Amino acid sequence: MNAIELSNVNYSSDQFNLKNISFKVPQGFVTGFIGRNGAGKTTIIRLIMDLYQPQTGVIRVLEEDMALNPIELKNRIGFVYPENYFNERWTTKQLEKMIAPFYRKWDHQVFEFYLEKFDLPINKSIKTFSTGMKMKLSLAVAFSHHAELYIFDEPTSGLDPLARNELLEIIQQELIDENKTIFMSTHIISDLEKIADYIIHLSDGEVILNGSKEQLLQRYQVVSGAIEDLDDELASLLIYEEHKRTGFIGLTEHAQVFKEILGHKVNITTPSIENLMVYL
């Protein structure tokens, strides 16, 4: 079963085009959505959330057409955006009073639990909160209506490394252990090295990589060695190639060929997700 399915989705604006976007987000796993700033990640999330409408294609969320049943489906989604979207004059108590009626399964006890867990004050206005506190408040809201799918758009953006690690630990503890579906967009790749099961890589409005993290990291290898050992035949097997003072470095799906020809002269390593994002 898939929590999200996009089939041949196209969307155009004055400055941006999404071209035949198709991918699936498996239910019960963490899918990392990566790409440079401006690649189109936020646009796709807004399409999924029915904030934008595609020119062509179909978007299904929790096995239903999002365009046909947006209100009910949004009740089943916990979402976190990078910017604060709450009225900053409100206190957390006032915030709950305003938003609870919109969620059929809103749980006051769960919300109170997370306010206490995250050490968020009840009677202070949101404008007094730090960036990290505002993000925790967004998570508390997302966690408090028994969602089945969580969509996070750059949840660690603007946080210092300590706060980022704390946030990732919260996501791991609260959601992964309960086998929830998480679709997490980020350009901070180290965030996904820890928690992602699947990776979707978007570049210039197109999906260029899609699969389980384990399979993708097994499929590609980073090779490096002396430039004089890199002949035209081997160079043709490189998806990415860079020359440095110390030699060449590249990405390939044919590491075994390099090993057979160059032997101990070539260094072969497993790439990181960040390597794949940079090299592909």
Protein language model annotation of sequence segments:
Residues 6-9, 16-26, 33, 57:
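Conserved beta-strand
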Residues 35-40:
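Walker A (P-loop) phosphate-binding loop of ABC-type ATPase nucleotide-binding domains
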Residues 49:
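Helix-to-loop junction immediately C-terminal to a conserved catalytic motif
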Residues 57-68, 72-73:
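Conserved ABC transporter NBD signature motif
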Residues 79-138:
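ABC-family P-loop ATPase nucleotide-binding domains
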Residues 150-154:
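Catalytic Walker B motif of ABC-type/P-loop ATPase nucleotide-binding domains
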Residues 168-252:
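ABC transporter nucleotide-binding domain
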Residues 238-280:
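C-terminal coupling/interaction segments
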